[in-house]
């Protein structure tokens, strides 16, 4: 996951990590995490802090080292910037701007991307994403489909 980050992002995260790592020992404890979160106006409980650490503490030692921190940041970034990207992608597919992606619109975009799909393949893609069964994909269905891949 962290391999999807640019050099610039990694160096920014290194700075952020140093801010968290108050005693400079190369790891972030729940206490250090709490201090930084509170300075950012958050008020996490001890249990929440422990959960945050456990979520990314790959080696299970109770602290976060830099590689674990990078993984956490990469996850967060994927989650946030994907929302914007998904909105943009939906607009690309929804040619007529009516809030729905039809089979024809899907076929058109896929063809432009160099994916020659049969009618059956296009219908199958629509069916997989079409939760409410109206034969087209609305924004919610599109988001679900994009986040589940």
From Swiss-Prot:
Classification via Gene3D superfamilies: EF-hand
Binding residues for Ca(2+) 2: 57, 59, 61, 63, 68
InterPro entries: CALM/Myosin/TropC-like, EF-hand-dom_pair, EF_Hand_1_Ca_BS, EF_hand_dom
Entry-annotated residues carrying N-acetylalanine: 2
Entry keyword annotation includes Acetylation: yes
Annotated Ca(2+) 4 binding sites: 130, 132, 134, 136, 141
SS bond partners: none
Domain EF-hand: 8-43, 44-79, 81-116, 117-149
Domain of life, source organism: Eukaryota
GO MF entries: calcium ion binding
PROSITE patterns in UniProt: EF_HAND_1, EF_HAND_2
Note in the entry: This protein has four functional calcium-binding sites.
Protein name: Calmodulin
């Amino acid at each position: 996951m962290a391999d999807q980050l640019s050099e610039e992002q990694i160096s920014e995260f290194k700075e952020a990590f140093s801010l968290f790592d108050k005693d400079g020992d190369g790891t972030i404890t729940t206490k250090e995490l709490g201090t930084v979160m509170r300075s950012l106006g958050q008020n996490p409980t001890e249990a929440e802090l422990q959960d945050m650490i456990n979520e990314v503490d790959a080696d299970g030692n109770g602290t976060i080292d830099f590689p674990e921190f990078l993984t956490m940041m990469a996850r967060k970034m994927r989650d946030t910037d994907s929302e914007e990207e998904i909105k943009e992608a939906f607009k690309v597919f929804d040619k007529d701007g009516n809030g729905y992606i039809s089979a024809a619109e899907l076929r058109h975009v896929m063809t432009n991307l160099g994916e020659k799909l049969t009618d059956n393949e296009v219908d199958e893609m629509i069916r997989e994403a079409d939760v409410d069964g109206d034969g087209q994909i609305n924004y919610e269905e599109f988001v679900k489909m994009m986040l589940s891949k």
